């Protein structure tokens, strides 16, 4: 009997988790920037014990269905249209904007995005009936050792990205 591929182990593990995080991909960056951010979000979910879900219906790289236009599905897909406007990435903190000296010029922009995050979380509560994490919850997993399902050893962030790449990067036939 051959060992189970990591993508199957990942899917079983992800499906066993109850608390969801819905990641919005294809927002406004180049494909590989979006892809790297998605792998980071997947690692964040594994590290925190959240179920990774994907919203890509409006992906800037898709032509009909988003992610599944090119790749096999690897997690539950969300389709609610409100994700387009309200499930957006987190931005620099007020403290970080002040440190950079851009607080005055960025205050309106930051306030607008903060309002969208609040509305997005309210919409998620109405749809799911409980707290659901959205794209703005994800923090960059820059360093450390991580435990991936099905692997006995701790892995670095680069090793984790390679493993998660084998989950997500599976072309449709």
Which residues fall in each region the model found?
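Secretory-pathway glycan-assembly enzymes, especially type II membrane glycosyltransferases
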Residues: 2-173
């Amino acid at each position: 009997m051959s060992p189970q591929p990591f993508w199957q182990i990942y899917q079983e593990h992800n499906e066993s988790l109850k608390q969801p995080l819905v990641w919005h991909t294809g927002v406004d960056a180049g494909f590989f920037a979006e892809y790297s951010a998605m792998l980071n979000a997947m690692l964040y979910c594994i590290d925190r014990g959240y179920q990774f879900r994907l919203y890509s219906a409006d992906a800037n790289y898709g032509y009909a269905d988003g992610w599944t236009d090119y790749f096999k599905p690897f997690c539950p897909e969300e389709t609610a249209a409100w994700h387009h406007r309200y499930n957006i990435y987190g931005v620099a903190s007020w403290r970080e904007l002040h440190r950079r000296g851009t607080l005055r010029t960025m205050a309106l922009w930051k306030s607008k995005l903060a309002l969208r995050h609040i509305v997005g979380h309210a919409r998620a509560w109405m749809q799911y009936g409980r707290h659901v994490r959205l794209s703005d919850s994800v923090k960059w997993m820059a360093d450390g050792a991580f435990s991936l399902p099905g692997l006995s050893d701790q892995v670095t962030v680069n090793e984790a990205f390679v493993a998660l790449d084998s989950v997500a990067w599976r072309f449709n036939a």
